[in-house]
Curated annotation (Swiss-Prot):
This is Tyrosine-protein kinase receptor TYRO3. Residues 41-128, 139-220 form the Ig-like C2-type domain. It comes from Homo sapiens (Human). The gene is TYRO3. Coiled coil: none annotated. Monomer and homodimer. Interacts (via N-terminus) with extracellular ligands TULP1 and GAS6. Interacts with PIK3R1; this interaction increases PI3-kinase activity. Residues 815-837, 851-871 are annotated as: Disordered.
Amino acid sequence: MALRRSMGRPGLPPLPLPPPPRLGLLLAALASLLLPESAAAGLKLMGAPVKLTVSQGQPVKLNCSVEGMEEPDIQWVKDGAVVQNLDQLYIPVSEQHWIGFLSLKSVERSDAGRYWCQVEDGGETEISQPVWLTVEGVPFFTVEPKDLAVPPNAPFQLSCEAVGPPEPVTIVWWRGTTKIGGPAPSPSVLNVTGVTQSTMFSCEAHNLKGLASSRTATVHLQALPAAPFNITVTKLSSSNASVAWMPGADGRALLQSCTVQVTQAPGGWEVLAVVVPVPPFTCLLRDLVPATNYSLRVRCANALGPSPYADWVPFQTKGLAPASAPQNLHAIRTDSGLILEWEEVIPEAPLEGPLGPYKLSWVQDNGTQDELTVEGTRANLTGWDPQKDLIVRVCVSNAVGCGPWSQPLVVSSHDRAGQQGPPHSRTSWVPVVLGVLTALVTAAALALILLRKRRKETRFGQAFDSVMARGEPAVHFRAARSFNRERPERIEATLDSLGISDELKEKLEDVLIPEQQFTLGRMLGKGEFGSVREAQLKQEDGSFVKVAVKMLKADIIASSDIEEFLREAACMKEFDHPHVAKLVGVSLRSRAKGRLPIPMVILPFMKHGDLHAFLLASRIGENPFNLPLQTLIRFMVDIACGMEYLSSRNFIHRDLAARNCMLAEDMTVCVADFGLSRKIYSGDYYRQGCASKLPVKWLALESLADNLYTVQSDVWAFGVTMWEIMTRGQTPYAGIENAEIYNYLIGGNRLKQPPECMEDVYDLMYQCWSADPKQRPSFTCLRMELENILGQLSVLSASQDPLYINIERAEEPTAGGSLELPGRDQPYSGAGDGSGMGAVGGTPSDCRYILTPGGLAEQPGQAEHQPESPLNETQRLLLLQQGLLPHSSC
C-alpha cells in the first residue's frame, strides 16, 4: 500500500507511482488557509503521519486516495468513531482510483483529534496513516470562579483554570472593575482575607491567540436566618402534638436546628424548649396535659446564630376518653322490638372531653353485629331474632374515643327481659313483668294528674298563690298557655327578652312555631357555632313531616350572635322558588330561668345533603360512582335559575359555593345558606362594613380589594361553583394561601380548565371571572347558555342518570334508609357511621345544613305558592335535550 499526501483536488491526475498493490490508500490533508496552492502541489510524504495545526474558525479539507479497487466504500474515522459529517465527497479519478474528501468549514476545538480513512476489502479492513489535527484559539476555561456565601470578614478562596492550545496560559484576577492579581500561570487560586459586603470577582485567561473572560462570581455575606412561618399543629391527641412549619430565609447558610418553645396559656410561666435537627421541619411534643390550652413558637438557627421567634400559636390538647361504663343496662320486650335503657354517664374528671353518643354492640349466634350509635340513654333494637339468646353491651364515646363497655346484658329467648351479669346467667321473668306493670300504672296516674292541672292552668291561669311576707293575701296570675300558631304569646314574650330589634321581630311574627309542635330527633351535623338535628313537625291537619332544625350552640349567649342567626331566617322567609331553599319556620327552645332561649331555624329536610359532599362522594367516597356530564350541567342550570331569581329580587348571596347548595329528594339543586346575604335597597352594590368570615377563594376581585359586593360578584362565585362541579368537588386554587389569592388573580391567573370539561362550559366560567364586573354575564344569560349546552348533549337513559332515580316519591324510608346510585354496590347510610354522602359524612362546616339520607314529603299546596315558570325544570331540560323546545340566547 502506498501513502501519499498532496493538495490534490477533484480531477487532479495521479502522481507517478510504482505499480500499486491490489489496494492502496492515500490520505491527504488540505489546509487552504495555511499553505498556498502552489506550495502544496508538490508536497509528497510517503507513509508518514502528519500533524496539522489550524486556528479556530478556519476551514480544513482532508482527502483520501484509494487505488486498486472499484467503487470503494470509504469511511472517515475520528478518534476511533466513524465521522457522521454530511459534507463528504467521493470522486472517481479512474476505474481503479477514487478520491474521498472530508470538509470542515469552520474548525472548533471539538474538531481536534486523530483522523484516518478506512476501506473494507474481502473481509479485511485497510486503514491509512493518521493525521493529527490541532485547533488553536483563545484560552478555554475548565474551572471558573463560583458563587459563595461567607461570614463577614472571613477568609475564602476562588479558583480559575484555562487551557490552550497554544500554551502557555496566564490568569489575571479582577475584583469588580479593579485588577487585583496576576498574571499567574494557569491554574490560579485567589486568596481573599474577607469582605464586608457582597462583592463580584472574575478572572481573565491570556495566550498568544488572545484572552477570554470567565463568568462573574458573586460572594454574598451570610446572615442570621429569618423567623419561621406557617406554624401548624398537624395532629393532636390528649398528650401529644405534632407541629410543622416552613423555614424562613436561611441567610445563605445551612439551617442546622430549630427550637420549639411550649407553655401553658394563658399566663403560663414554665416554658418547655425542644431542639430538633432539620430538615424535616417537624417536631413531636410529648407528655402534654389533656384538655389544656397551650401556646408554642419556633425559631431556627444556622452557623451564625438563631433567628427571631415566630409569633405564639395557640392550641388545645384533646380530653381523655370516658373512664366510666354505663350502669344499670336493662331490656324491655315490646311487640315492635326490644327497648334497651341505661343510666347516663357523668364525666368523672374535667380532663375528659364532652361526652358524645353511646355505642351499642350486640351478639347473636356467636356473631357480633354492627355497632349502633345512639343519642340518649334509650335504644329500640329491631333487627334481632327473639327466638335466640342475645348479648348486649353499651359504652359512651367522645371526640377522643370510647369508654369501657358495660357488663354484658343477656336476653334469653325464654325471658321477657334481660339481666346484667355473665353471658350465661338466667333470671325469672315474673319480677320484671310486675315491675313493668307497676311502672305503667304509675305513669298513667301521673299523666292524668298533670293533664288535669294543665287544663285548669290553661283555662284560668294560676291564681291565689301564697301570701306575701307581710301576711297580706296576694293574687298571682300566669297567662294561660296557648298553642295557637297565629298568636304565640309565650314565644313572643321570649323574643322580647332576647333584645333583638323590633324590625326583626315583626318579620318573624308569622313564622314562629311553638316548641311543643315538633320533636327533635338525631343529630345530623355539627359546626363551629351550632348544630343541625332531624325533627318531626306536626302540621295543622295533625300529620307529621320530617324537617331539619338548625340551632345555635348552648354556650353562645350574645344577643348579637342570636340576632345575626335569626336574620338569615328572615332573609329566607322572602324566597319562594323551586331552586331556592325556603324557610319552614322559627322557634325558640326554652332553658332554665335566667338563661337566654336557644333560637332554632326550621328548614326543609334535604335528603341528599349538600352538593359539595355529594360530588366528593362520587369521586373519592368508599364506593365512587359516575356522574355523567349531562347531570353536572343540570346541576349548574338549577343553581343559575335560583340565582337568577335572587338577583331579580335585588338579593346578593355573597357565599355562593357548592357546599351551600342542597340536593332535594328528586336531585334538584336549591341555593341555600343565606348567612352572608344582603338585600340591596338602593343602587346596585353593598359594601362590607365589618369583619366577617368570608369565603376568600370564591370572592371577586372587587370584593377582595374594596369589600364591594354586587350581583356581578355573585356571578364570579358562580363561575367558581361551576369549576367545583366539573372537578367533582376539588378545592379551588389548591396550594395557594388565602392571603395570596388577590395577587394571584390580579396577575391575570385564573382556575385552569378541568379535565373532560367542554370548551363552551369553560368559556362561560372564564367570562364569570372577568376583572371588569360589567363584562361578566348575567344569571339569565348564564342560565340560557347552559340550557343550550345541555340541549346539545345526548339524552341519558334512566339507568345512566341518578336524576331519574326516585323522581316519583316512594314510601318514606326508615331511619338509616338508603338510596341506590349507579355504580354503587351498597347503599349509603345516614348519620350513623359518617360514611354517607350527606354533610354528616364529611367535616361539618360552620353550621351548614342538611344532609343526610331521609325524605321530606311534599307539602300540600306547595306548588301553588311557587312562582310561575315556563315548565317544570326536569320537563324543560328534557324537552331541550330532545330538540322540542327552542333555545334562547343571551
